[in-house]
């Protein structure tokens, strides 16, 4: 129905405010768009990205003629100041960020902490106790998995409370040493220390 209304509509004079003008494109179709190798956007949009300096360096290195076209509007003082000022920080960021297919960011080694598991019995209310196990993370044991294992093994509540601490509800100081050695053989008898009853 809408197409019929358009065909039957009378021509509108050009001096009307609601007149639509259709402009014709003079360039060749399809358009050839140059995409940036850093941000993967068309090079005209690189200026809106946070790492403009990297985009400019890439464009200057790979397409110097396009780079000169884009930098015509920028005064020489602005261009050199921005590129030099951000180039040093851009290079540092480039080292940190992982590139496609690259090695990625090098993880810093953790400080060598002595591998020791400590077990303590902490009094709670009246005659109730909780058992605290610390140091399992030094043996690269996942604390969440260990917490689940202890809760299942002793049929009680267990939770990861600290960076390297598991609290088990109940007094299991006698059994837990054997259970740890049985489950994780890399934890030997010398590296487990029983602190006995400790106050919070």
Curated annotation (Swiss-Prot):
UniProt xrefs under Pfam families: DENR_N, SUI1
Domain SUI1: from-to ranges: 117-184
Basic residues compositional bias, start-end: 97-112
Comp. bias (Polar residues): 78-89
Domain of life according to the entry: Eukaryota
Family of the protein in this entry: Belongs to the DENR family.
Function: May be involved in the translation of target mRNAs by scanning and recognition of the initiation codon. Involved in translation initiation; promotes recruitment of aminoacetyled initiator tRNA to P site of 40S ribosomes. Can promote release of deacylated tRNA and mRNA from recycled 40S subunits following ABCE1-mediated dissociation of post-termination ribosomal complexes into subunits.
Name of this chain's protein: Density-regulated protein
Species this protein is from: Xenopus tropicalis
């Amino acid at each position: 129905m809408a197409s019929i209304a358009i065909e039957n509509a009378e021509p509108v004079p050009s001096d009307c405010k609601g007149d639509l003008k259709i402009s014709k494109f003079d360039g060749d179709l399809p358009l050839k768009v140059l995409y940036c190798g850093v941000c993967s956007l068309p090079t005209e949009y690189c200026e809106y990205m946070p790492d403009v300096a990297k985009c400019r360096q890439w464009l200057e290195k790979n397409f110097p003629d396009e780079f000169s076209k884009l930098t015509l509007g920028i005064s020489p003082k602005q261009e050199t100041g921005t590129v030099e000022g951000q180039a040093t920080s851009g290079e540092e960021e480039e080292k940190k960020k992982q590139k496609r297919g690259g090695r990625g960011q090098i993880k810093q080694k953790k400080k060598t902490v002595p591998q020791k598991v400590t077990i303590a019995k902490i009094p709670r209310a009246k005659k109730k106790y909780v058992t605290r196990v610390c140091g399992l993370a030094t043996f690269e044991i996942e604390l969440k998995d260990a917490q689940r294992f202890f809760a299942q093994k002793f049929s009680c509540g267990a939770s990861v409370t600290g960076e390297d601490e598991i609290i088990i509800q109940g007094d299991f100081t006698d059994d837990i040493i054997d259970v740890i050695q049985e489950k994780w053989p890399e934890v030997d008898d010398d590296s487990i220390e029983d602190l006995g009853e400790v106050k919070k």
